[in-house]
């Protein structure tokens, strides 16, 4: 069996991107995640090669010298997001610099950045491109763009910016696949009724995550008035007295708020960190009068039921919502592996990884 290409995942979170690349044939050798419970989730699923540290501290202390074939990651995206207003001075916007420092120090052949769509038009996105070219990477309009996860077998309309670059030669983004997955397919086998309101154990997996909130009578009234595919405007038409004043004053936009999913198409939403709050987006179950559960959100993100989650229910929700859907990552990984093979790239030898990993641990 050929030696696999070696992978480093920065800002790895729970490991959705690692999972997809591993499915595509890569071997994860190092990951970095500063949030301790997120890193523990990663460790439980992929092994002890995760560093629960701030990437800035690692780079300042000498950096990562472990050689790798590919570096992947999503520098914290809140500083670029439309949802967070004007964040010109947000320190998280500078995290790309440390990412590119690791790209340089690992001497990787390919790197992949995943982020919110605004990254591509931001000064930081343009700076990533400039730095990549300075380091000798091929990067072009064909290797970066906005992809929709539903075009890659993920049952949600998640739009993400992808930047790919290669030292070997021109690389292109993956092409959409034909097998679109519906909410019904994604939630097959999940009972309609949640089993609890709190986590019973941690690490939690599969049905352990089928937990629901205790809605107030007013919330239940609101849920019942939202038809399949409907949203807050249906509530306003049917029951103005149950509609918050701020929604009534906001006559445009916000069409996902208090939205209900449809069974037979991908979710018309992005699974975010507060998917258990329907006032935050289109998170009502297709036919039950409740928000989706953690288990259902993980399914819509294409995580397998065997995946182990660590932390409180709120922290697990953040991990689920922040994650790159593994199926999306798998298609990106397959494109990267195809590119490496087309150029006859040899994987970093295992003994070089072992030697460098020993130095990192020390």
Give the ranges of each region predicted by the language model:
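C-terminal target-recognition/interaction regions appended to catalytic cores
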Residues: 210-362
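A short, Lys/Arg-enriched amphipathic alpha-helix followed by its capping loop at the start of a domain
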Residues: 20-27, 45
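Class I S-adenosyl-L-methionine
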Residues: 60-68, 78-257
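Conserved SAM-binding strand-loop segment of SAM-dependent methyltransferases
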Residues: 48-54
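Conserved proline-anchored active-site loop of SAM-dependent methyltransferases
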Residues: 7-21, 65-83, 111-116, 163-167, ...
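Conserved beta-strand positions in the Rossmann-like core of class I SAM-dependent methyltransferases
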Residues: 8, 29-30
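Short alpha-helix immediately C-terminal to the canonical SAM-binding loop
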Residues: 36-40
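Conserved acidic E/D residue at the C-terminus of a beta-strand in Rossmann-like folds
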Residues: 32-34, 114-115
